[in-house]
């Protein structure tokens, strides 16, 4: 009974209660992604690892999943999440680890790590820095590909 209740709670939180009896092969990419998140939530673990949890989702579902993840974290679950969307990272992460070629180039509080300089040196993309009016946090807006070889290093940000 405990496992069934955990599955029902997780399916409800992820908005997939109506999909519990649908074969996985019949689900869209976005539905499948939300079902996978529900499966993760049903485990009720103290640490949750997520790899691109908003892939295949439309903007409304992306935000609802990110809000759900924030609520999960607020309730005491540690969440480690891989995300490539800089706006999502800036808005939802407390701490960031930036990697390039499998190596950590920066880590720390989001406000310290998420800069146009970091994006330029890590992803070779020029950005403008904006301020999110709802959180007050800075976030980069990509504007062009930075063609020259990387000239600096971010090793000092660790």
Task: Enumerate the predicted regions with their spans.
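Conserved ABC ATPase signature
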Residues: 23-27
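ABC ATPase nucleotide-binding domains
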Residues: 120-158
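Helical segment within the ABC ATPase nucleotide-binding domain
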Residues: 62-75
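Catalytic Walker B motif of ABC-type/P-loop ATPase nucleotide-binding domains
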Residues: 48-52
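Conserved ABC ATPase "signature" region
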Residues: 2-19, 44
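Hydrophobic anchor residue at the start of the ABC signature
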Residues: 37-38
């Amino acid at each position: 009974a405990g496992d069934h209740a955990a599955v029902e709670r997780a399916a409800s939180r992820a908005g997939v209660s109506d999909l519990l009896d649908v074969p996985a092969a019949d689900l869209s990419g976005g539905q499948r992604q939300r079902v996978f998140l529900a499966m993760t939530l049903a485990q009720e673990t103290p640490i949750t690892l997520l790899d691109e949890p908003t892939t295949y989702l439309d903007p409304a579902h992306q935000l609802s999943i990110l809000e759900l993840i924030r609520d999960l974290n607020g309730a005491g679950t540690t969440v480690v999440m891989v995300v490539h969307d800089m706006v999502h990272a800036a808005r939802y992460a407390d701490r960031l680890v930036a990697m390039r070629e499998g190596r950590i180039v920066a880590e720390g509080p989001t406000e310290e790590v998420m800069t146009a300089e970091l994006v330029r040196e890590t992803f070779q993309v020029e950005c403008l820095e904006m301020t999110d009016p709802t959180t007050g946090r800075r976030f980069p807006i990509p504007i062009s590909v930075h063609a020259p070889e990387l000239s600096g290093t971010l090793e000092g940000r660790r």
